[in-house]
């Protein structure tokens, strides 16, 4: 199943800080420098980078290893509030 990856503007600094703290605390690792979003989900870099420490456009588009987490942009904004 092909996934379309879109690079969007990052969320506000406050939201990014809160989300980074949340992900770091719960996942142990986070990559805050590059924000890639699918249509509704954030790419969970800890799972992806284990096998492919590359940019998303270099990953096979048909793999399920994108390891998408159901973290919608609106939910990210809620974390920052």
Curated annotation (Swiss-Prot):
Induction remark: Expression is up-regulated during the late stage of P.nodorum wheat leaf infection and is controlled by the cluster specific transporter elcR.
Function: Part of the gene cluster that mediates the biosynthesis of elsinochrome C, a perelyenequinone phytotoxin structurally similar to cercosporin. The first step of elsinochrome C biosynthesis is performed by the polyketide synthase elcA which catalyzes the formation of nor-toralactone. The starter unit acyltransferase (SAT) domain of elcA initiates polyketide extension by the selective utilization of acetyl-CoA, which is elongated to the heptaketide in the beta-ketoacyl synthase (KS) domain by successive condensations with six malonyl units introduced by the malonyl acyltransferase (MAT) domain.
Protein name, entry field: Elsinochrome C biosynthesis cluster protein SNOG_08613
Biological source species: Phaeosphaeria nodorum (strain SN15 / ATCC MYA-4574 / FGSC 10173) (Glume blotch fungus)
